[in-house]
Amino acid sequence: MKNLNLVALPHFVSVENLKNDEVKALIKRAEYFKKSGAVARLTSPVYVTNMFFEDSSRTHTSFEMAERKLGLTVIPFDPAHSSVNKGETLYDTSLVMNALGIDLEVIRHSQNEYYEDLINLKQHQKLNIGVINAGDGSGQHPSQCMLDMMTIHEHFGHFKGLKVAIVGDITNSRVAKSDMELLTRLGAEVYFSGPEYWYSKDFDQYGKYEELDKLIPEMDVMMLLRVQHERHSGDPNEKKFDAHRYHEKYGINHKRYEAMKKDTIIMHPGPINHDVELSGDLVESDKCMFVRQMENGVFMRMAMLEAVLRGRKLGGLE
């Protein structure tokens, strides 16, 4: 691809340290992969393993598809049958993978910022492996964030001045935290809605909380979030949760769908709870980008993986 500044990174664990021009370059690279069908040409083998300590369908399969399209050799890893169950630390597991010849790890883990121990090494530590964060607890989800940015850019062609509403279980959503960070930096106006008990004043620096029906007619993007029941341990509001009531107050139904602007898009990181965040028969509607997001995820993850290959000079890429 001509006239493109290709990104090179030693790891890809968060969007916080990405420069705006790197974000835009990754979007362009992913769009190039999608339109051209081209892939990076590796001149030497690269070995990757996907270490998912939390359940995943989309992200796990999407990363593996991206890896295979790039020509990487994927080495299976099953946490349920690993030595982690014998008490082995994530660092030691990574050290084992590294010693066996693994070049890259794609990791999803319930611990926030689990990657700090793997990338900020002490003087005596010898771990030398690229880490791609596929989601850390309620912290960050950089690949979902980047595919969201790609999907928005693909539809609108820009970010500046777009009005984006992030709706739902915001406090427990790693997607929301990554997306609000990048959207505001790229010039979008961010708004929040959903149950106030799942909203934190910490988010006020990124946008404004409003009632959903006030936002509906004004927004360009409606970004819906799954209710994260698995992260509500000890939360008294979980016991009071009622799916029908949530859908009535915070979900996108036909009435709200019809009240949106003509060009408004609906996004959701998945999995969608039908008739909770979104009416089930709207999942494949014209405005809903759910399927498009999944399609774009493969190409964006190719761009992210390629950036780490370049950063680590793997596969003959520099």
Curated annotation (Swiss-Prot):
Molecular functions per Gene Ontology: amino acid binding; aspartate carbamoyltransferase activity
Which GO annotations describe the biological process of this protein? 'de novo' pyrimidine nucleobase biosynthetic process; 'de novo' UMP biosynthetic process; amino acid metabolic process
Q: Answer whether the UniProt record assigns the keyword Protein biosynthesis to this protein.
A: no
Q: What domain of life?
A: Bacteria
| SUPFAM superfamilies per UniProt | Aspartate/ornithine carbamoyltransferase (SSF53671)
Bilayer-crossing residues are none
Question: Which pairs of positions does the record mark as disulfide bonds?
Answer: none
Tell me which residues bind L-aspartate.
K86, R174, R226
Q: What class of enzyme is it?
A: transferase
**Has the keyword Transferase been applied to this entry?**
yes
Q: Which Pfam families match?
A: OTCace, OTCace_N
Q: Which GO terms describe its cellular component?
A: cytosol
The UniProt subunit note reads as follows: Heterododecamer (2C3:3R2) of six catalytic PyrB chains organized as two trimers (C3), and six regulatory PyrI chains organized as three dimers (R2).
The role this protein plays is: Catalyzes the condensation of carbamoyl phosphate and aspartate to form carbamoyl aspartate and inorganic phosphate, the committed step in the de novo pyrimidine nucleotide biosynthesis pathway.
Name this polypeptide is given: Aspartate carbamoyltransferase catalytic subunit
Record organism:
Lactobacillus helveticus (strain DPC 4571)
Lineage here is: Bacteria, Bacillati, Bacillota, Bacilli, Lactobacillales
User: What's the gene?
Assistant: pyrB
